[in-house]
Amino acid sequence: MNKLKQFIIQIILLFCTSFAAEASGPLGIDHRLTRADTGIWSRNNQLFLEYSSVVLVLGESLWLGSDTRLGKTFWKSTDSMIITAVGSAATKEAFRRERPSQGNDPNTWFKSSTDRSFPSGEVAHITAIITPFIAEYKNDNPFVWSLAVLPIYDGIGRMKSQGHWQTDVLAGAALGAGIGLYNSSRDTPFSVAILPNTITIGFNKRF
């Protein structure tokens, strides 16, 4: 839990320092961080988090099936991940915001179709994945809140690699959390309702 506290303190300090004189953007907090994407913050680690989370969520959904509490939560997480990916891509295309690495102006919007800074798709992705688990198990096991470390880590990493502005990260987290909470409230996950029972029943039941 000490590491969790350190991460939370770090992101709070990071956003507090955003209120510098040079900060701008829609909330007045955006500024480009000095590039420092090495070590724990390396781009490879960020991509590993993204890709491994996809494999884990899809794999566990297919293995456990939807008949158990945990299995159903994984399917809700799968739905959240897919819907968030579509929503994030559409939002990026609509707003076309320039990344910090492309220029030092957080107010550059609607410029080029290659500008896709807003919102942070990776932060939205990992937030959408963890939200159903927090919503489902928060009362049974408060330690599930430690999953919040993942989007916090990813958000800091994306800003340190100059891939996103502060408001990109906040918007991504809000998008992922919103979609995750919506899917958490559903009794039957979308995927389970659409896919054949032979897929959603769980491969572990076949062995």
Feature-to-residue mapping (PLM):
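Bacterial N-terminal signal peptides that target proteins for export
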Residues: 1-9, 44-48
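Outer-membrane beta-barrel architecture
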Residues: 128, 132, 178, 202-204
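Bacterial N-terminal signal peptides
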Residues: 9-18
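Alpha-helical membrane-inserting segments
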Residues: 17, 87, 91, 95, ...
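Outer-membrane beta-barrel proteins
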Residues: 62-65, 137, 181-190, 205-207
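Hydrophobic alpha-helical bundle signature of multipass membrane enzymes
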Residues: 22-117, 123-159
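Outer-membrane beta-barrel "beta-signal"
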Residues: 196-207
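Interfacial helix-loop-helix junctions of multi-pass membrane proteins
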Residues: 97-105, 153-184
